[in-house]
């Protein structure tokens, strides 16, 4: 009990510190300028490209990529196992993962289960652990997404992928363990059919859903987690118990990227499809006004907040809180993002200035794995690994 009390006091102290720090220098800063093209201490490096051939059988599609990334995937899978075993030292949870999760196959939609089987085979990681690795992303995605329209009606979509909160803190270098281990797993993917691009995405090797992507010339899509009491854990439990009329959110976003042929079709599917976990879908199109944040409960859409430049709404910003509510006081990335967009102005929004906004603390923080910039009309899709050197807020 004394140990637990000590942990509680440490967490309380950290929370109070973050509450104060997030709104005061040096953990926040004036809006950054001239950070693009990426360089300097907040730039970790470029993200490699791989082609995923959709003409191959699903079992074989990921083999080339996973041969390269198997060693780093094993590192993060082992880290997650160690964290679980720390809380449940008996090892029974991992025993259930390894023995029971593969029995759920036959219940996943489309090609996803064959793809996961193929990844397990080529990496020599138990199939149950590959499945749990894919479930993992339904629960811990903490992000900032923005769609902005310039004075000419041109759209730019930007996002920071923040991931790994409370999943192990490295006291030696002040970083989140899982966040750092995800960086070498980050890949750009060119999904092709008949040697032609169907869509492009940034993802983590071993994950067959999609969190960030675009269909050149048509639309862009990012996914943010939505915290809710009626949340992902409940949805996963219901799914395990046999309720199969819902879609995994990462599988839905991939299905939309792969099959939808217009902004409106994508919006319709993202608005109406029953999903496993609450989420925000941030969607951008190819013409003026085509940008929105879809706030989803598991069964229905609660809100579709759209661009309306004529009414002065030339951007939409989404973090992980409903737009009509105040962000959690320990985690307000929305306010600084909006402040920097307003200072940038519609006249000056561009790839360069969008990167500036996403490089400003605390929009950029210790959880940030990568930043993506998308221009649907020009076919530009750029992803950069990020660092947030001290002093930098933990989230």
From Swiss-Prot:
It catalyses: an N-acylsphing-4-enine + H2O = sphing-4-enine + a fatty acid; a beta-D-glucosyl-(1<->1')-N-acylsphing-4-enine + H2O = beta-D-glucosyl-(1<->1)-sphing-4-enine + a fatty acid; a globoside Gb3Cer + H2O = a lysoGb3 + a fatty acid; a globoside Gb3Cer (d18:1(4E)) + H2O = a lysoGb3(d18:1(4E)) + a fatty acid. Activated by Ca(2+), Mg(2+) and Na(+) cations. Inhibited by Zn(2+). Phosphatidylserine and phosphatidic acid stimulate while cardiolipin, phosphatidylcholine, lysophosphatidylcholine, phosphatidylethanolamine, phosphatidylinositol and sphingomyelin inhibit the reverse ceramide synthase activity. Phosphatidic acid, phosphatidylinositol and C16-ceramide inhibit the ceramidase/hydrolase activity. Keywords: Cytoplasm, Disease variant, Disulfide bond, Epilepsy, Glycoprotein, Hydrolase, Lipid metabolism, Lysosome, Neurodegeneration, Nucleus, Secreted, Signal, Sphingolipid metabolism. Glycans are attached at residues 173, 195, 259, 286, 342, 348. Broadly expressed with higher expression in heart. Changing residue 80 to Q: No effect on autocatalytic processing, but loss of ceramidase activity. Changing residue 362 to R: In FRBRL; loss of ceramidase activity. Changing residue 143 to A: Loss of autocatalytic processing. Loss of ceramidase activity. Changing residue 342 to Q: Loss of ceramide catabolic process. One of its GO terms (biological process) is cellular response to tumor necrosis factor. One of its GO terms (cellular component) is nucleus. Switches substrate specificity upon intralysosomal accumulation of glycosphingolips. Such is the case in Gaucher disease where the regular catabolism of glucosylceramide (GluCer) fails due to the lack of GBA1 activity, its accumulation triggers the alternative catabolism by acid ceramidase which deacylates GluCer producing a free fatty acid and glucosylsphingosine (glucosylsphing-4-enine, GluSph). Similarly, the intralysosomal accumulation of globoside Gb3 in Fabry disease due to an inactive GLA triggers its alternative catabolism by acid ceramidase, generating lysoGb3. This is Acid ceramidase. It comes from Homo sapiens. The gene is ASAH1.
């Amino acid at each position: 009990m004394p140990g637990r009390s000590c942990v509680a006091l440490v967490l309380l102290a950290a929370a109070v510190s973050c509450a104060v720090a997030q709104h005061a220098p040096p953990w926040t800063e004036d809006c950054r300028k001239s950070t693009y093209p990426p360089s300097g201490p907040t730039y970790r490096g470029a993200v490699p490209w791989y082609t995923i051939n959709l003409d191959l059988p699903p079992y074989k599609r990921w083999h080339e990529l996973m041969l390269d990334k198997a060693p780093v995937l094993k590192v993060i899978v082992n880290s997650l196992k160690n964290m679980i075993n720390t809380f449940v030292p008996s090892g029974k949870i991992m025993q259930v993962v390894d023995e029971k999760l593969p029995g759920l196959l036959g219940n996943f939609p489309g090609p996803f289960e064959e793809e996961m089987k193929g990844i397990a085979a080529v990496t020599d990681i138990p199939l149950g652990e590959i499945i749990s690795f894919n479930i993992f992303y339904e629960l811990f995605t903490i992000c900032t997404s923005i769609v902005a329209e310039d004075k000419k009606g041109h759209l730019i979509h930007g996002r920071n992928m923040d991931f790994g909160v409370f999943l192990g803190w490295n006291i030696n270098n002040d970083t989140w363990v899982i966040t750092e281990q995800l960086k070498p797993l980050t890949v750009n993917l060119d999904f092709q059919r008949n040697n032609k691009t169907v869509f492009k995405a940034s993802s983590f090797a071993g994950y067959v859903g999609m969190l960030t992507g675009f269909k050149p010339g048509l639309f862009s899509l990012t996914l943010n987690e939505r915290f809710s009491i009626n949340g992902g854990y409940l949805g996963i439990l219901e799914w395990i118990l046999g309720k199969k009329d819902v879609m995994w959110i990462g599988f839905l976003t991939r299905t939309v990227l792969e099959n939808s042929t217009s902004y409106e079709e994508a919006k319709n599917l993202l608005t109406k499809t029953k999903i496993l976990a609450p989420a925000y879908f941030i969607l951008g199109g190819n013409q003026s006004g085509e940008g929105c944040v879809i706030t989803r409960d598991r069964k229905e859409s609660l809100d579709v907040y759209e661009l309306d430049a004529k009414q002065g709404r030339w951007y939409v910003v989404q973090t992980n809180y409903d737009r009509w509510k105040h962000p959690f006081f320990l985690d307000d990335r929305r306010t600084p993002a909006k402040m920097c967009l307003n200072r940038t102005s519609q006249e000056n929004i561009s790839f360069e200035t969008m990167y500036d906004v996403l490089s400003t603390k605390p929009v950029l923080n210790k959880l940030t794995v990568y930043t993506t910039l998308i221009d649907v009309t020009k076919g530009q899709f750029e992803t950069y690994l990020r660092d947030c050197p001290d002093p930098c807020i933990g989230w």
